[in-house]
UniProtKB/Swiss-Prot annotation:
This is Visual system homeobox 2. Residues 148-207 bind DNA. It is found in: Nucleus. The gene is Vsx2. It is linked to Defects in Vsx2 are the cause of ocular retardation (OR(J)), a mouse disease characterized by microphthalmia, progressive destruction of the retina, and absence of the optic nerve. The OR(J) mutation is due to an OCHR (STOP) mutation. It comes from Mus musculus (Mouse). Transmembrane segments: none annotated. Residues 266-290 have a biased composition (Basic and acidic residues). The lineage of its organism: Eukaryota, Metazoa, Chordata, Craniata, Vertebrata. Disruption phenotype: RNAi-mediated knockdown in the retina of newborn mice results in an increase in the number of photoreceptor cells as a result of a decrease in the number of bipolar cells and a comparable increase in rod cells at postnatal day 21. Interacts with MITF. Expressed in the retina (at protein level). Expressed throughout the anterior optic vesicle and all neuroblasts of the optic cup (at protein level). In the mature and postnatal retina is restricted to the inner nuclear layer, in which its expression decreases from the outer to the inner margin (at protein level). Also detected in regions of the developing thalamus, hindbrain, and ventral spinal cord.
Amino acid sequence: MTGKAGEALSKPKSETVAKSTSGGAPARCTGFGIQEILGLNKEPPSSHPRAALDGLAPGHLLAARSVLSPAGVGSMGLLGPGGLPGFYTQPTFLEVLSDPQSVHLQPLGRASGPLDTSQTASSDSEDVSSSDRKMSKSALNQTKKRKKRRHRTIFTSYQLEELEKAFNEAHYPDVYAREMLAMKTELPEDRIQVWFQNRRAKWRKREKCWGRSSVMAEYGLYGAMVRHSIPLPESILKSAKDGIMDSCAPWLLGMHKKSLEAAAESGRKPEVERQALPKLDKMEQEERAPEAQAAISQEELRENSIAALRAKAQEHSTKVLGTVSGPDSLARNAEKPEEEDATEEDRPAEKLSPPQLEDMA
């Protein structure tokens, strides 16, 4: 052996380690991995110099990585920070453990210290408590929803018939109609009101396709036409030949039919009145005939009485004129009653029969 080789062999390992640590650290080539892009491999500013890490024996590094890797026998959860050998508890080894070798080693390196483990435990407990709260809230909401849910009302055929009849008559029944339906069908009024709401929605959905066109019949132009007794289009009237209920707009046609009937009745009324007028005239004439006769007789009596009064007035006027004409007329008038008295005295007494004489006696 040469002298240089012997000196190298005689030197202790500690000196060689110190020399190696005192030298510059070899540059690592960084790839374009996820950790490098996200900056997970950046070292904190308070970390120890990397020169001491490079001086650690490669066997120790392999042992630590084999223990921390998923394929290894143990793990940090099983061994814990106190379960590793004593030389692994040095600060240089802790920095090696904190160096992220892969993605799955990063959270384990952060939880290396006892303080970190306590923090993670507290965060886990908080997560569990928050999840429990969420579960309890969701359970309460579900129970509330279940309580609010109502059972579906099952209608009998009789009830449906009565409700459909009422719906054909009026889509919006008033309070009195709802009360009558409640008495007939033995249903509460709120159920009847809900049924009418659902039935109107169903009717609107069906009537949107009415006439294969645009507008609903009840609230559109055709409803106004019916209200003002304007004739409907022929396409609508033709659909009513098979029956109003089988047509495209049963409620509209029913309303149109009612308006036509009302118009026909209003047209018949003047004709009936005209026909009834001559009959009434005849009846009135017959009834007024005795009244007219009585009125005529009364008029005749009045006329007769007036004529008699006039005759008496003329007689009185002639008498007055006679008295005014001269005293001769007065003397004549005075002589006349004397003559009459004389004539009565000069008349011969009539012969009385014996029974009359007896009666006089």
